[in-house]
């Protein structure tokens, strides 16, 4: 995972001080890209322990089209709690945009179903895109999408994915984002009969919060360990049929967890 550590180092070396919505303050760079060959291991950060259950449950929650934290809570995941209202609602966030994008005529578009079918039928299409950034809905969202658009690419029987992330909390959020979209790429590849290619992660504003600088330095003092493997239940052929029982990470070696506050 040297790609991730290189981003931490770049922010330390080149970052500029900026104010932000949360009032915490950040050190930020603009424009960065990381590339991971998914055939060489599952890209879980190893220089601190990640709670993989939260990552995987959240992705399944997105794919359900859900925007209420109730299902997350039922599955012992609390990463969205700070943004939910008293009823657990978050507004039209990722799940709504992915599975039920509202059209002006009152109809909706299931972007995930659509892109999977396009991969199967038109793998060379340059329109294999899913967007969570819906300007008409931004003000109704508890938190506008940070990872806001992704595109699939098929070549030589392999499926690759590129994510554009407008805003990236590099210490807390980015390790989750890498693993989430790597998992999604594996899942979509399996249900479309493809092997995995690359995950490309492209950033707009990539930042470390001012109260994460010491934690980032600690992480950089640790040597990365070999990447684990991802194993999916090969019997699952429907993207929406995956459950936590179908997802397994093997040989995840990692350093100890590093605690850090969430900027809300």
Swiss-Prot record:
Residues annotated as binding dUMP: 21, 126-127, 166-169, 177, 207-209
Location in the cell: Cytoplasm
Enzyme Commission number(s): 2.1.1.45
Any Pfam family the entry gives: Thymidylat_synt
Positions with a binding annotation for (6R)-5,10-methylene-5,6,7,8-tetrahydrofolate: 51, 169, 263
Annotated SUPFAM superfamilies: Thymidylate synthase/dCMP hydroxymethylase (SSF55831)
Active-site residues from the entry: 146
InterPro entries found in the cross-reference section: Thymidate_synth/dCMP_Mease, Thymidate_synth/dCMP_Mease_dom, Thymidate_synth/dCMP_Mease_sf, Thymidylate_synthase, Thymidylate_synthase_AS
Broad class of the protein's primary localization: cytoplasm
Catalytic activity: dUMP + (6R)-5,10-methylene-5,6,7,8-tetrahydrofolate = 7,8-dihydrofolate + dTMP
Pathway: Pyrimidine metabolism; dTTP biosynthesis
Keywords attached to this entry: Cytoplasm, Methyltransferase, Nucleotide biosynthesis, Transferase
NCBIfam families: PRK01827.1-3, PRK01827.1-5, thym_sym
Record's function text: Catalyzes the reductive methylation of 2'-deoxyuridine-5'-monophosphate (dUMP) to 2'-deoxythymidine-5'-monophosphate (dTMP) while utilizing 5,10-methylenetetrahydrofolate (mTHF) as the methyl donor and reductant in the reaction, yielding dihydrofolate (DHF) as a by-product. This enzymatic reaction provides an intracellular de novo source of dTMP, an essential precursor for DNA biosynthesis.
Subunit structure: Homodimer.
Similarity comment text for this entry: Belongs to the thymidylate synthase family. Bacterial-type ThyA subfamily.
Protein name according to UniProt: Thymidylate synthase
């Amino acid at each position: 995972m040297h790609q991730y550590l290189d981003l931490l180092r770049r922010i330390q070396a080149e970052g500029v001080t900026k104010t932000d919505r949360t009032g915490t303050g950040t050190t930020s760079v603009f424009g960065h890209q990381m590339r991971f060959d998914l055939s060489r291991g599952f890209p879980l950060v190893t220089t601190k322990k990640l709670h993989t259950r939260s990552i995987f449950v959240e992705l399944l929650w997105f794919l359900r089209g859900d925007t209420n934290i109730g299902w997350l809570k039922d599955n012992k995941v609390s990463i969205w709690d700070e943004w939910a209202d008293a009823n657990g609602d978050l507004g039209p966030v990722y799940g709504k945009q992915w599975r039920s994008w509202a059209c002006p005529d009152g109809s909706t578009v299931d972007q995930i179903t659509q892109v999977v079918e396009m991969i199967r039928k038109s793998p060379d299409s340059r329109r294999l895109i899913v967007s969570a950034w819906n300007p008409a809905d931004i003000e109704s969202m508890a938190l506008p999408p940070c990872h806001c658009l992704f595109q699939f690419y098929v070549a030589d029987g392999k499926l690759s994915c590129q994510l554009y992330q407008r805003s990236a909390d590099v210490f807390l959020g980015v390790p989750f984002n890498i693993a989430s979209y790597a998992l999604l790429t594996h899942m979509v590849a399996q249900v479309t009969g493809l092997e995995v290619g690359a995950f490309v992660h492209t950033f707009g504003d990539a930042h470390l919060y001012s109260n994460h600088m010491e934690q980032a330095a600690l992480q950089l003092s640790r040597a990365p360990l070999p990447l684990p493997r991802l194993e999916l239940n090969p019997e699952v052929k429907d993207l929406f049929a995956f459950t936590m029982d179908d997802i397994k990470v093997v040989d995840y070696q990692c350093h100890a967890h590093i605690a850090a506050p969430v900027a809300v």
